[in-house]
């Protein structure tokens, strides 16, 4: 048992050492082993193996639930027992698993998340979870549930918010499903093969992503490495495909109602992070929130807009799609500067001239009050300085450029901490 636990720790990067519980539709046990579902079917295996190489413990014609989870989303390290399959992207997978010839979306539920498990510790940048007082345990089902879900056109869309149908879809009779126990080194092989670690400092070779000085990059790197869930070429391809369709107005008819709802939500955004149209800004922010495991519109937009995996090359993903990475980086840089204004707010007394007074009903002021809600002791001059920073940023789209032009760099050190909670708050603004 101790050897298995040691192997589990070694299979993960130091900042990713897992806690027991659900990871990508597979259940990590206290002894370091992984329990999950295995699907045996020749056509299904052939479909998945076109994209994912077999792990060292895979038998012929077998794929694992964690592989299907990644294949459908391109995301890693999701604290979830559930994953979605969209017809728009994966009609061939829907047919292989169920024999269904058309639907909008299937949800596969591999088990039950223990009621004592809380998703995030408030203010924790690493996204680690903690347990409550309830003794409810995570449970792996003997056979996964599979449900046909109506496409959501508003509100929260994550599996925690859907109303489950009274009856589930039937698995195809030639798909044999069993539960298996695996070594985590084998289960983790998929991540080690596909993950980019794009936000590591040594990968900082893309000029358009160098948005901060090296010392700020180093301060943000741990957050960006640990909080994101989509750091893979496959996820980049999905985002690129959906963004290309959105930009070219090449929208599938089945997605028209969803898109109409998103246009309204995009119009309500107060803060634009990139110099692109408002709907594209909203899409990129939702993709970032989806990476951060926030149940909003990101999954639904990607699922209903993205084409088949092989369509990514047409959309330009093969050349490296970076806009969602840039959006996440810009949000993190702005969070660092806003938090630094609060951390060193006493120094703002020396600003000459002082920032203009902020009107109480100013929409950006409302955003800032929500952003600073958990900081405590936020002074009026801090809100005014932050308002001026965001107003200048709206013209330049350069966080540090605005910070310097307003003279804040002479008074305030950009050395505050940034948490996942701050990122989420700014991306929602």
Swiss-Prot record:
Cysteine disulfide partners in this protein: none
Induction: Expressed during the late times of infection.
Keywords (A to Z) from UniProt: Host cytoplasm, Virion, Virion tegument
GO cellular component, one term: host cell cytoplasm
InterPro entries: Herpes_U59/UL88 (IPR007616)
Domain of life (superkingdom): Viruses
Keyword check for Transport: no
Entry annotated with the keyword Hydrolase: no
Compartment(s) of residence: Virion; Virion tegument; Host cytoplasm
Function statement: Plays a role in incorporating a subset of tegument proteins into the virion.
Family designation: Belongs to the herpesviridae U59/UL88 family.
Subunit description: Interacts with UL48.
Protein name as catalogued: Protein UL88
Designated gene of the protein: UL88
């Amino acid at each position: 048992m101790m050897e298995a636990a040691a192997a589990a720790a070694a299979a993960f990067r130091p900042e990713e050492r897992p806690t027991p519980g659900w990871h990508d539709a597979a259940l990590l046990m206290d002894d370091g082993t992984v329990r999950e579902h295995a699907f045996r079917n020749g056509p299904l295996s052939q479909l998945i193996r076109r994209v994912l190489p077999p792990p060292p413990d895979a038998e012929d014609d077998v794929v694992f639930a964690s592989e299907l989870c990644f294949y459908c989303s391109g995301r890693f390290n999701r604290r979830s027992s559930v994953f979605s399959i969209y017809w728009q992207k994966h009609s061939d997978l829907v047919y292989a698993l169920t024999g269904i010839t058309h639907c909008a979306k299937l949800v596969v539920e591999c088990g039950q998340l223990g009621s004592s498990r809380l998703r995030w510790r408030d203010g924790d940048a690493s996204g680690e979870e903690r347990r409550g007082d309830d003794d409810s345990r995570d449970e792996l089902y003997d056979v996964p549930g599979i449900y046909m879900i109506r496409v959501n056109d508003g509100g929260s869309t994550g599996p925690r918010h859907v109303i489950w149908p009274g009856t589930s879809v039937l698995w195809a009779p030639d798909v044999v499903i069993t539960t298996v126990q695996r070594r985590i080194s084998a289960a983790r092989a998929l991540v080690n093969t596909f993950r980019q670690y794009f936000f590591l400092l040594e990968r900082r070779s893309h000029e358009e992503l160098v948005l901060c000085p090296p010392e700020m990059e180093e301060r943000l790197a741990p957050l960006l490495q640990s909080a994101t869930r989509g750091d893979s070429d496959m996820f980049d391809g999905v985002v690129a495909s959906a963004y290309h369709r959105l930009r070219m107005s090449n929208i599938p008819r089945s997605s028209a109602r969803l898109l109409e709802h998103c246009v309204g939500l995009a119009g309500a955004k107060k803060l634009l992070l990139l110099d692109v149209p408002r709907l594209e800004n909203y899409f990129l922010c939702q993709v970032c929130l989806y990476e951060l495991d926030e149940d909003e519109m990101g999954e639904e937009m990607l699922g209903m807009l993205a084409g088949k995996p092989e369509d990514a090359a047409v959309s330009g993903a093969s050349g490296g799609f970076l806009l969602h990475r840039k959006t996440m980086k810009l949000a993190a840089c702005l969070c660092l500067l806003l938090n630094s204004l609060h951390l060193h707010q006493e120094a703002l007394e020396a600003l000459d001239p002082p920032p203009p007074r902020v009107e109480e009903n100013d929409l950006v002021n409302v955003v800032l009050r929500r952003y600073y809600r958990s900081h405590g002791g936020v002074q009026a001059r801090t809100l005014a300085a932050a308002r001026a920073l965001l107003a200048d940023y709206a013209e330049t789209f350069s966080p540090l450029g605005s910070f310097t032009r307003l003279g804040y760099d002479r008074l305030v050190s950009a050395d505050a901490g940034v948490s996942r909670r701050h990122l989420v708050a700014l991306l929602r603004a």
